[in-house]
Amino acid sequence: MLDIQLLRKDLDGVAKRLADRGYTLDVAAFTALEAERRDTQTRTEEMQARRNSLSKQIGALKGKGEDTSAVMAEVSGIGDEMKASAARLDEIQKRLSDLLLGVPNLPHESVPLGKDETENVEVRRWGTPRQFEFEVKDHVDVGAPLGLDFETGAKLSGARFTMLRGQIARLHRALAQFMIDTHTQHHGYTEIYTPYIVNPEILYGTGQLPKFADDMFRVEKGGDENTVTQYLISTSEISLTNTVRDSILEADALPIKLTAHSPCFRSEAGSYGRDTRGLIRQHQFDKVEMVQIVAPETSYDALEQMVGHAETILQKLELPYRVITLCTGDMGFSAAKTYDLEVWVPAQNTYREISSCSNTESFQARRMQARYRNAQGKPELVHTLNGSGLAVGRTLVAVLENFQNADGSVTVPVALRPYLGGLERLELPAA
């Protein structure tokens, strides 16, 4: 959530920066609500002052032994008016809050201007795409004989669900374990096992609600009269980041670096017809997430560090990739700046997103009321960052395609072999 004081001080400037990312701020609605708030607040304060003055008069009259009934009646009437005015002020504040909950973050000054993904800026590349001496297969054709089972997944749960069997299941598990071990043993993260179901207010904290309710899977428990609505997490960023909600941390507790391997559940409401074949876009997929909670002055250094941590995974797996800075028009709702890592997918002859690393600055922290004591000992909002380290299913796609062999086998990347008992190749089952 944006700082409402910023809108009050520079509404036109905020509207311009939001327009850069393709969002039109309802300036008229905000201005009208602000005027109503100021008027109601002024009236409430005037009534408070009048009541205080009358209370002093009552004391003086009693001291003189004079009748106070008329003044006390006026005080009582003012009290009733103040209650109504306070209720009105609360209602206006809620409408302002609801308006702000739908407003995205402001882009950092270093973010390139652009309307959509075509105007993202490439930062660097690593690795050289392999030149194959045979016709390249996509991961579906490579993986199906090795245990990638789309038919059973669809039979059990419908489209965009997949079952992994045998060698493929082991490889998938090895990838996640390798990622977690790298982040905890070399990058300083603490591993967390997180709930996969959260309460609605948790999603407001990280920005999935109210705007992206259609992208979430909702679950209900209890009978008709006592139904409780909760949500399946679309990323463990949600639960990891909210561990500091409603907290005031000591400065020496920062930075906090957390990582988790979890399934993620997304309805993909806006992606009909996109990536319908294979593992690229699923309703359920695994991801290793990185989250950092830091002091504001260190957050952009932390962002670069986090990108480096995701890059390390790709480099150890020997997967070619590139780093992209997202332009203003392509960033996620909560982000002030985002880097995407895109891995080379041979069958598509292109790079595809495998990690997204974002600094949300104080946007999520303000919604969560996550603070720390600064050098002056005063509570100040932390900055929160999140990044994929990596999406496990998409990494599996990249391994199957980049390490495929002409005979249908797949060479296991060297970094993964200790997690597979030294296995060097996934072999086709004997006929």
UniProtKB/Swiss-Prot annotation:
Subcellular location: Cytoplasm
Keyword line: Aminoacyl-tRNA synthetase, ATP-binding, Cytoplasm, Ligase, Nucleotide-binding, Protein biosynthesis
Documented EC number(s): 6.1.1.11
Positions contributing to L-serine binding: 235-237, 289, 388
Binding site for ATP: 266-268, 353-356
Pathway assignment: Aminoacyl-tRNA biosynthesis; selenocysteinyl-tRNA(Sec) biosynthesis; L-seryl-tRNA(Sec) from L-serine and tRNA(Sec): step 1/1
Top-level enzyme category: ligase
InterPro entries from the UniProt entry: aa-tRNA-synt_IIb, aa-tRNA-synth_II, aa-tRNA-synth_II/BPL/LPL, Ser-tRNA-ligase_type_1, Ser-tRNA-synth_1_N, SerRS_1_N_sf, SerRS_core, tRNA-bd_arm
Catalytic activity annotation: tRNA(Ser) + L-serine + ATP = L-seryl-tRNA(Ser) + AMP + diphosphate + H(+); tRNA(Sec) + L-serine + ATP = L-seryl-tRNA(Sec) + AMP + diphosphate + H(+)
GO terms for cellular component: cytoplasm
Molecular function in Gene Ontology: ATP binding; serine-tRNA ligase activity
UniProt-listed CDD domains: SerRS_core
Pfam family name, one: tRNA-synt_2b
Gene Ontology annotations of biological process type: selenocysteine biosynthetic process; seryl-tRNA aminoacylation
Origin: domain of life: Bacteria
Major location (coarse): cytoplasm
PANTHER family in alphabetical order: SERINE--TRNA LIGASE, SERYL-TRNA SYNTHETASE
Subunit record text: Homodimer. The tRNA molecule binds across the dimer.
UniProt family annotation: Belongs to the class-II aminoacyl-tRNA synthetase family. Type-1 seryl-tRNA synthetase subfamily.
Domain statement: Consists of two distinct domains, a catalytic core and a N-terminal extension that is involved in tRNA binding.
Purpose: Catalyzes the attachment of serine to tRNA(Ser). Is also able to aminoacylate tRNA(Sec) with serine, to form the misacylated tRNA L-seryl-tRNA(Sec), which will be further converted into selenocysteinyl-tRNA(Sec).
Listed NCBIfam families: serS
Protein name per Swiss-Prot or TrEMBL: Serine--tRNA ligase
Organism ancestry: Bacteria, Pseudomonadati, Pseudomonadota, Betaproteobacteria, Burkholderiales
